[in-house]
């Protein structure tokens, strides 16, 4: 079985699926990805990770600013592909595009739908304290992640998983599950599952201000925040008026009478801060213009300011 496929994706999450399709018996006719944009401190124009893979494999690359344009839609239809595979593309597909393929448009989504529809399912799952997430392969419709589900594969969320950890695991699971689903879809050997609207939750886009730590929250909630916002936008607090990023932190199973934000202790185990309930121990930190450092190195550099019983952060 060899399907003619149009692939649409942009970030690193989409790369394993594109690679899997390239290495399979299927034919990738073209790759749609978002236009090159300025990125980083120097605002250098960068191509997407998906574009890089397509270029390396000499696959035609198409980068429209929108697919609402009639000319772009006709171009898509003219490819006469069997199916469109969409993985974190970032552009809305109009009805004409959704109906342009014999087997429809199939999406790889990083949650167990209908939980966490939307832009940030990985981060929202960690923030909510979910114990599992996964991949859903979905037949796209005009709604936001509301289409019928072709397949699901669950993945445990450990107490130490960051968004980066889950991102990498789920991207690989998604690639494998997509190939399995395409084979069944072509044979007609697949049962579509309607989503339960009553169980739907929405994973709104992460805003930078969400990364600011409120020490009145519980240590458990703040630890989730640190994990969910690694590698971006990185949870942060303030130290001597400067934003201080926290890359790694753990919950200490102890009680304290200190007020939220007060330093409990600072030693080789880490820097322990009282939260609304419980204690959060900081292990990896970063001040502006500096490299990420261990708590031990931070103590060596700023130990004179780390006085137990004082409000040092926040």
From Swiss-Prot:
<keyword id="KW-0808">Transferase</keyword>
<dbReference type="InterPro" id="IPR036477">
    <property type="entry name" value="Formyl_transf_N_sf"/>
</dbReference>
<dbReference type="InterPro" id="IPR044135">
    <property type="entry name" value="Met-tRNA-FMT_C"/>
</dbReference>
<feature type="binding site">
    <location>
        <begin position="111"/>
        <end position="114"/>
    </location>
    <ligand>
        <name>(6S)-5,6,7,8-tetrahydrofolate</name>
    </ligand>
</feature>
<dbReference type="InterPro" id="IPR001555">
    <property type="entry name" value="GART_AS"/>
</dbReference>
<dbReference type="Pfam" id="PF02911">
    <property type="entry name" value="Formyl_trans_C"/>
</dbReference>
<protein>
    <recommendedName>
        <fullName>Methionyl-tRNA formyltransferase</fullName>
        <ecNumber>2.1.2.9</ecNumber>
    </recommendedName>
</protein>
<dbReference type="InterPro" id="IPR011034">
    <property type="entry name" value="Formyl_transferase-like_C_sf"/>
</dbReference>
<dbReference type="InterPro" id="IPR037022">
    <property type="entry name" value="Formyl_trans_C_sf"/>
</dbReference>
<dbReference type="Pfam" id="PF00551">
    <property type="entry name" value="Formyl_trans_N"/>
</dbReference>
<dbReference type="InterPro" id="IPR041711">
    <property type="entry name" value="Met-tRNA-FMT_N"/>
</dbReference>
<keyword id="KW-0648">Protein biosynthesis</keyword>
<dbReference type="GO" id="GO:0004479">
    <property type="term" value="F:methionyl-tRNA formyltransferase activity"/>
</dbReference>
<dbReference type="InterPro" id="IPR002376">
    <property type="entry name" value="Formyl_transf_N"/>
</dbReference>
<dbReference type="InterPro" id="IPR005794">
    <property type="entry name" value="Fmt"/>
</dbReference>
<comment type="similarity">
    <text>Belongs to the Fmt family.</text>
</comment>
<dbReference type="GO" id="GO:0071951">
    <property type="term" value="P:conversion of methionyl-tRNA to N-formyl-methionyl-tRNA"/>
</dbReference>
<comment type="function">
    <text>Attaches a formyl group to the free amino group of methionyl-tRNA(fMet). The formyl group appears to play a dual role in the initiator identity of N-formylmethionyl-tRNA by promoting its recognition by IF2 and preventing the misappropriation of this tRNA by the elongation apparatus.</text>
</comment>
<dbReference type="InterPro" id="IPR005793">
    <property type="entry name" value="Formyl_trans_C"/>
</dbReference>
<dbReference type="GO" id="GO:0005829">
    <property type="term" value="C:cytosol"/>
</dbReference>
